[in-house]
C-alpha cells in the first residue's frame, strides 16, 4: 500500500492519518464522548478503543462515515489462547467494530511455530474486517521481524502496527526499515509516544500510512496554528 507524504503545504491532510486512541481503562463515558466528538469535528480517520467501549463509541459516532471504529484485540500483550482471541474479534465485529488492531502470539514467533503464528492471524482475518497486527516491532530481532511480516501478510493482515504504546516511541528509522521489509504490500501504522506535529509528520514522510496517538487533537490544533502563521 503506497504511502502519501505530507509536505508543509498539505497539513490539511493530517486528520486522514490520525487514529485517535481511547485505550485508557480509567476513561469514563464523558471523556469517551469528548474524544468521539473530536473525531467527528476533526474528521479523524479512526477511533481506536477497547471492546468494553465499542458500543458507547459507536452510539456517539452515530452516522459519521469518516471515522472508522477500530477495536483492539488481545490488547496489550496478546498472551491469551487463540480461540479466545478469535472470540474477541468476532464479538468486536458484532458490536460495531469496522477494523481490528490485533496483538499476536509472540511465543509462537520466538519458538519457531510460525505456522501457528500465521494461522491465528488468518482466522481473525477470515472474519472479514480489515486487520492490522501489532508487532511491537522495535523489540523484535530483525530476522524475527522479517519473518513475522511475511507471515502476517500471507495470513491476510492489511497492516502492521509498530507497537502497543507501552514500549519505545515510534521513530523515523524504524518506519523506514518496516517500509523496506513490507515493500508496499500492506499499510504501516506508527504508534507509541507520538505527541507532536513534528513527530507525526516525520513518521508519515518516512512511510507511515496512519498515526495511532492519544494526542490527535493536540497534533491537529498544532497543525492548524502552523497554517495560520504561514
Locations of regions flagged by a protein language model:
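Conserved, mostly hydrophobic/aromatic
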Residues: 19, 57, 92, 133, ...
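Glycine-rich phosphate-binding active-site loops on the catalytic face of alpha/beta enzymes
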Residues: 21, 71-75, 79, 94-109, ...
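Glycine-rich, proline-tolerant flexible connector loops at the mouths of alpha/beta enzymes
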Residues: 36, 40-56, 75, 100-118, ...
Amino acid at each position: 500500500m503506497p504511502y502519501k507524504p505530507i509536505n508543509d503545504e498539505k497539513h490539511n491532510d493530517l486528520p486522514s492519518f490520525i487514529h485517535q486512541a481511547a485505550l485508557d481503562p480509567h476513561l469514563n463515558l464523558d471523556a469517551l464522548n469528548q474524544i468521539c466528538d473530536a473525531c467527528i469535528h476533526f474528521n479523524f480517520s479512526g477511533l481506536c478503543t477497547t471492546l468494553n467501549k465499542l458500543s458507547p463509541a459507536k452510539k456517539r459516532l452515530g452516522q459519521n462515515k469518516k471515522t472508522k471504529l477500530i477495536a483492539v484485540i488481545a490488547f496489550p500483550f496478546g498472551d491469551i489462547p487463540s480461540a479466545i482471541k478469535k472470540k474477541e474479534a468476532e464479538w468486536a465485529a458484532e458490536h460495531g467494530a469496522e477494523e481490528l488492531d490485533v496483538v499476536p502470539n509472540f511465543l509462537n514467533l520466538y519458538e519457531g511455530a510460525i505456522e501457528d503464528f500465521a494461522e491465528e492471524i488468518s482466522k481473525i482475518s477470515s472474519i472479514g474486517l480489515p486487520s492490522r497486527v501489532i508487532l511491537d516491532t522495535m523489540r523484535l530481532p530483525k530476522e524475527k521481524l522479517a519473518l513475522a511480516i511475511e507471515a502476517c501478510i500471507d495470513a491476510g493482515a492489511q497492516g502492521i502496527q509498530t507497537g502497543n504504546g507501552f514500549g519505545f516511541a515510534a521513530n523515523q528509522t524504524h518506519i523506514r526499515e518496516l517500509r523496506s521489509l513490507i515493500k508496499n504490500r500492506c499499510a504501516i501504522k506508527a504508534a507509541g509516544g507520538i505527541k507532536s506535529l513534528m513527530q507525526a509528520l516525520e513518521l508519515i514522510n518516512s512511510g507511515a500510512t496512519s498515526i495511532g496517538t492519544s494526542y490527535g487533537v493536540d497534533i491537529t490544533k498544532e497543525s492548524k496554528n502552523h497554517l495560520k502563521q504561514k
